Design a protein with these regions (language model features):
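Alpha-helical interface subdomain recognition
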Residues: 1-130
Length: 130
């Protein structure tokens, strides 16, 4: 983004939406790292609570979906191209990782179920009954 220029000569990195997306990815990644370090510590001390594990799963899966979506927005149409497509940026890895990240929102338990675990086990809220 620093070296890439738009048709009018401006650098991509100077665009407000690019800076905002990169900042959100950086901040979200740092928050996730701290969350996982805490989870690793509590696990090694046999203190891991189901609500903490569910919180990390929900946050991580949704963070990666949003981060890859943000990267595809920055790359424009070329970021949405699959591997071996002419003009694909980063050999189509961003598009592939975006699709893979979507699976994380339901693999290992849907995020809706994980939110129920957080509510019941972490917040002592009653079980939701439709």
């Amino acid at each position: 983004a620093r070296k890439t220029r738009l048709a009018d000569g401006r650098r991509v990195i100077d665009q407000p939406f690019v800076r905002r997306n990169l900042a959100k990815c950086q901040a979200g990644g740092e928050a996730l790292k701290l969350m996982l370090w805490k989870q690793a510590w509590t696990l090694t001390h046999s203190r891991l609570h189901p609500a903490e594990a569910s919180t990390a799963k929900v946050y991580a899966s949704e963070f990666f979906v949003e981060a890859y979506r943000s990267m595809m927005e920055i790359f424009g149409a070329a970021g949405k191209l699959r591997a071996r497509s002419p003009g694909a940026i980063l050999a189509g890895r961003v598009e592939r990782m975006y699709r893979s990240a979507l699976i994380l929102t339901f693999g290992g338990g849907t995020n809706e179920v994980q939110r129920d675990i957080i509510a019941m086990a972490g917040l002592q809220m009653p079980n939701y009954k439709a």
